[in-house]
Design a protein with these regions (language model features):
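Glycan-recognition and catalytic cores of secretory/periplasmic carbohydrate-active enzymes
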Residues: 1-174
């Protein structure tokens, strides 16, 4: 998902239609065939990635917390590029069900993978040998307010429903 975020950035910066069509096809494939109901992505632990189309097991779902963060990034970039709310529909599911599920309410324990089913033996842990998720969550969570609003030309978008205030420039108006 991080590579796809970069690809979306390149598409937006260059206007290269090959990149635009490619990232749109990738997004369509992910959303229609590889996305869990929760917004989690990545069914395989072996490659920390996608499996075949419709390979979405519950008990062995990988749905890494970092992948959910990356899914927020790519959907935000595609929303900014296309201006279509469908990207925020996916972003919101990934944020609330994939990212926030990855950290305990106290902020001291984490899920690396987020399986959808457990026989009771799965719990958040304080640390991992590969501790990308805790540090990634620490970096990502303070950025959430930046996803609430967006402006484009003379339009204001309220993308996430949460308490807050903001001063925004919309067209020539503040």
């Amino acid at each position: 998902t991080y590579m796809y975020s970069g690809m979306a950035d390149v598409a937006a910066l260059t206007g290269d239609t090959a990149y635009i069509h490619a990232i749109d096809r990738i997004w369509d494939n992910i959303v229609s065939k590889k996305l869990y109901l929760t917004g989690g992505i990545g069914s395989r632990a072996s490659n920390e990635g996608f499996g075949a189309n419709y390979e979405l097991p519950n008990a062995t779902a990988y749905c890494e917390t970092c992948a959910s963060i990356g899914n927020v990034y790519v959907n935000h970039r595609l929303f900014l590029f296309h201006g279509d709310g469908k990207y925020y529909d996916v972003l919101e599911r990934s944020l609330y069900n994939g990212v926030l599920a990855g950290i305990s309410l106290k902020g001291d324990a984490f899920f690396y993978p987020n399986p959808l089913e457990s026989a009771g033996g799965y719990e958040r842990k304080p640390w991992f040998g590969c501790a990308c998720c805790p540090s990634n969550l620490c970096r990502f969570l303070p950025s959430v307010p930046g996803y609430v609003y967006a402006t484009r030309d003379d339009s204001l978008y309220v993308n996430l429903f949460m308490e807050g205030t903001s001063d925004l420039n919309i067209g020539k108006n503040k």
